[in-house]
C-alpha cells in the first residue's frame, strides 16, 4: 500500500515542478484528481522528452524552418528595384550630359557625307573637281593624278618622253611637235675592223667583226642596240640636243 500511495505523490511533485497549470482543481473528486494527475505526468514527460513526440508533428516543424529561411529573402525585390532606379537615373544623367555635345550632320555642308566616306588623302576628296576654298574657279589639280613628266604647272616644266629633255611649260607644245615630227636619224651600217671601246647603250665592248651603226655625229653603236634605242628616241644617246 505504501508503494502505491507514493506513486501519485511523486507524480504530483513532478507536476508542480514543471507544469502547474495541469494540476486538477480542488473541487474535483478523488477519481478525477487521480486521472488529472496522470495527464499532468504525461504532459510533463512530453515536455521533458521531446524525442517521444509522434513523427506526425515533425513536418510542421520542418515547414516552419523553411518558412523562416524564406522570410529574409522577401526584401530583395525592393532592393533590386531601388538599384534599377539608380542605374536608370545615372544613364539618364549621362544622356543629358552628352546632349550638348551632339555631332552636327556632316551632310549639311556644301559636300555631302558620301564625299567624305569615299575620299582619301591620295585622290583629294574622291577625285571631284572642286574650287579651292569653296570659291568659284577651275578644277583643282591633285598631286599624283598625272605622271611627273605630264604635270608642267606643278614642277615648272616636264621631261620630254621622246628626247628625255626637260622643257619649260611655255615651250611644251612646240617641243612635242618638233620631237614627234622630226625625221628619224639615219645611220650607216658597217662592220667594225678593230676594237673600239664599249657601246654606250649596252655597255659592252665593241669588238672587231661586230656589226655597228655609224651616226652622222660619228658615234658608233651596236646595230641591234641603236635600233632598240630609236624605237623610243629620235636622237643620239650621247648628243640628245642635235
From Swiss-Prot:
Annotated EC: 2.3.2.27
A GO BP entry: protein K48-linked ubiquitination
Ranges of biased composition (kind: Gly residues): 30-41
Lipidation (N-myristoyl glycine): 2
Tissue: Highly expressed in the brain, with higher expression during development than in adult. Expressed also in mammary glands, testis, colon and kidney.
Modifications made to the protein after synthesis: Phosphorylated; leading to binding to YWHAE. Phosphorylated by MTOR at Ser-145 and dephosphorylated by PP6C. Ser-145 phosphorylation stimulates vesicle-to-cytosol translocation.
Phosphoserine, modified sites: 19, 21, 25, 82, 89, 113, 116, 135, 145, 151, 193
Domain notes for this protein: The RING-type zinc finger domain is required for E3 ligase activity.
UniProt-recorded name of the protein: E3 ubiquitin-protein ligase ZNRF2
Organism the protein comes from: Homo sapiens (Human)
Amino acid at each position: 500500500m505504501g508503494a502505491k500511495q507514493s506513486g501519485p505523490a511523486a507524480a504530483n511533485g513532478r507536476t508542480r515542478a514543471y507544469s502547474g497549470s495541469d494540476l486538477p482543481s480542488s473541487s474535483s473528486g478523488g477519481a478525477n484528481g487521480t486521472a488529472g494527475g496522470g495527464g499532468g505526468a504525461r504532459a510533463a514527460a512530453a515536455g521533458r522528452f521531446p524525442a517521444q513526440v509522434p513523427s506526425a508533428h515533425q513536418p510542421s516543424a520542418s515547414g516552419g524552418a523553411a518558412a523562416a529561411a524564406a522570410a529574409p529573402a522577401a526584401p530583395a525585390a525592393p532592393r533590386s528595384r531601388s538599384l534599377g532606379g539608380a542605374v536608370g537615373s545615372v544613364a539618364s544623367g549621362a544622356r543629358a550630359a552628352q546632349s550638348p555635345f551632339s555631332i552636327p550632320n556632316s551632310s549639311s555642308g556644301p559636300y555631302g557625307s558620301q564625299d567624305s566616306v569615299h575620299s582619301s588623302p591620295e585622290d583629294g576628296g574622291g577625285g571631284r573637281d572642286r574650287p579651292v576654298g569653296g570659291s568659284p574657279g577651275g578644277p583643282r589639280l591633285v598631286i599624283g593624278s598625272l605622271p611627273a613628266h605630264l604635270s608642267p604647272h606643278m614642277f615648272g616644266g616636264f621631261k620630254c618622253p621622246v628626247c628625255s629633255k626637260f622643257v619649260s611649260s611655255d615651250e611644251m607644245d612646240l617641243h612635242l611637235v618638233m620631237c614627234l615630227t622630226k625625221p628619224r636619224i639615219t645611220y650607216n651600217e658597217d662592220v667594225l675592223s678593230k676594237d673600239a671601246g664599249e657601246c654606250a647603250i649596252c655597255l659592252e665592248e665593241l669588238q672587231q667583226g661586230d656589226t655597228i651603226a655609224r651616226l652622222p655625229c660619228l658615234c658608233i653603236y651596236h646595230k641591234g642596240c641603236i635600233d632598240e634605242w630609236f624605237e623610243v628616241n629620235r636622237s643620239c644617246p650621247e648628243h640628245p640636243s642635235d
